[in-house]
Design a protein with these regions (language model features):
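Membrane-embedded alpha-helical segments of transport systems
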Residues: 64-70, 92-111, 222, 260-272
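Alpha-helical transmembrane segments and their lipid-water interface positions
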Residues: 36, 40, 70, 74, ...
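Transmembrane alpha-helix interface/packing and boundary motifs in multi-pass membrane proteins
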Residues: 65-67, 218-236
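Predominantly cytoplasmic-facing regulatory/coupling regions of multi-pass membrane proteins
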Residues: 1-59, 116-226, 257, 264-285
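Hydrophobic alpha-helical segments and helix pairs
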Residues: 85-136
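Re-entrant/interfacial helical elements at transmembrane boundaries that shape
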Residues: 75-84, 229-246
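Extended non-transmembrane interhelical loops and adjacent amphipathic helices
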Residues: 56-85
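Membrane-interface alpha-helices at helix entry/exit sites of multi-pass transporters
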Residues: 53-55, 72, 86-100, 249-261
């Protein structure tokens, strides 16, 4: 029988020998930033030569700006602030490709979570959401991998011509660069997932590997598709985490603590650092 808890005593956690789990989750945060910076360096390099240090600063600056925008849409504009202004249009194309790689990864793992959820808790609404997610994933994949093929069909449309410049720039990316961006997005997603499972373990949430992975996949997908602002996202994260994980544990305080901890580690801390870098950049200019 699973041990059911409704509250967590922080002192007990630190005294129980579980503190290394928290340390490991914290250590993985710089790895997250490093992976995303490496991806940005590869993709942004098509528009302008980018050093790894500059890529790290761009990623942190993007996180800082994303925290005050709906569904973090300000992340990529924030990154462009660190790049040369004359390359802005090219970098917008880079941002578009990076965003598509991120969404392709998100929906791929999200569908795995949805398949698991439908198998465990079948229902009409869950099935409809799964089908819709598969359709959206297919569209994203076609745009990501076959842009050059299908874009020709829309060249005659006046509204599409306004985006022709971005389209031509997107064609400059090689298949290898696209796959590298996609692979790094997937690796970063798995690191996020590992952090969450580590924090849940720290909070004594009993989960099997399959339960933990699939539910975490679904959690990250859900918070990405639900409209929100990062500053107000914490409440949504809490509600989604309780809805998904209450099926495996009654430790509501532990679930919420792990969710809040992940939010602080991967968003708040990098956003603070990024804000300092942005302020410093403005002062230097």
């Amino acid at each position: 029988m699973q041990k059911q808890l409704t509250q967590v005593d922080p002192e007990d956690l630190f005294m129980s020998g579980l503190t290394p789990f928290l340390v490991l989750a914290l250590v993985l945060m710089p790895l997250n930033i490093a992976i995303e910076a490496f991806k940005w360096k590869i993709l942004a390099g098509v528009a302008q030569p980018t050093s790894y240090t500059q890529a790290v600063k761009s990623v942190l600056g993007g996180i800082a700006l994303s925290i005050v925008t709906p569904n973090r849409i300000g992340e990529y504009p924030g990154r462009i602030l660190y790049m040369k202004r004359k390359n802005t249009i090219r970098l917008i194309s880079v941002a578009i490709l990076a965003a598509f790689a991120q969404f392709l990864t998100l929906f791929t793992f999200g569908i795995i979570g949805l398949l698991y959820y439908n198998a465990q808790f079948p229902g009409t609404m869950a099935l409809i959401i799964l089908i819709a997610a598969i359709i959206i994933l297919t569209i994203i994949a076609l745009i990501f991998f076959r842009f050059e093929s299908w874009s020709a069909y829309f060249e005659h449309l006046s509204w599409f011509r306004r985006f022709r410049t971005y389209g031509h720039l997107l064609k400059r990316f090689t298949t290898s660069q696209q796959l590298q961006g996609l692979a790094l997005s997937a690796i970063r997603f798995l690191v996020f997932t590992a952090q969450y499972l580590i924090l849940l373990r720290w909070m004594n949430i009993p989960l099997s590997p399959v339960e933990g992975l699939c539910t975490a996949f679904l959690f990250f997908w859900a918070i990405a598709v639900i409209p929100s602002i990062a500053l107000a996202e914490l409440g949504i994260r809490g509600q989604v985490s309780l809805f998904l994980f209450h099926n495996f544990s009654a430790n509501t305080m532990g679930i919420l603590a792990a969710t809040i901890g992940l939010w602080c580690i991967n968003l708040v801390i990098p956003a603070v650092v990024g804000s300092i870098l942005l302020i410093r950049m403005r002062l230097l200019r």
